[in-house]
């Protein structure tokens, strides 16, 4: 999948603010600070399209990006960061759940985890929730450049076991671009499939 054009469409919190739903969508979800924005920017070959930050919990809206006029990338707020005010956390849960549960044009969820960390209780809960709603999910382990190749493989197997995944999660590095083409290929395949 070749990225030709990318444009920011809008931010929203409620379904009434979402784009029309005429294009297939791929959503990106994960804990705060797992490298979600860096993954999106690397996939799209844009430096600051999705805002990266050293402050976890920066993304507090659902952000929609039009890719090639043929699909939307949807950047969902990161979850699980302690220093985010409790009132904000209470809004995030329903906002993310409503989008993931109800969005008809959602073709795939890219579930992002830091390769150096074990899945949290929140990760396990979200995975169970996505399974329950039958959402096609691609698991991606970021920050692989922080580990040796052997350690990356070991962590890949460990996360697969922890989440009881039928296939190995993909390994990705924003720094080296490792995994970029494979992730884009999975997105391309999902884009063409209607939700079953």
Curated annotation (Swiss-Prot):
Entry keyword set: Cell cycle, Cell division, GTP-binding, Magnesium, Metal-binding, Nucleotide-binding, Septation
Residues involved in Mg(2+) binding: 37, 59
GO molecular function, one term: GTP binding
Organism field: Syntrophus aciditrophicus (strain SB)
Keyword 4Fe-4S: no
Protein name as catalogued: Probable GTP-binding protein EngB
SUPFAM superfamilies (UniProt xref): P-loop containing nucleoside triphosphate hydrolases
One Gene Ontology cellular component: cytosol
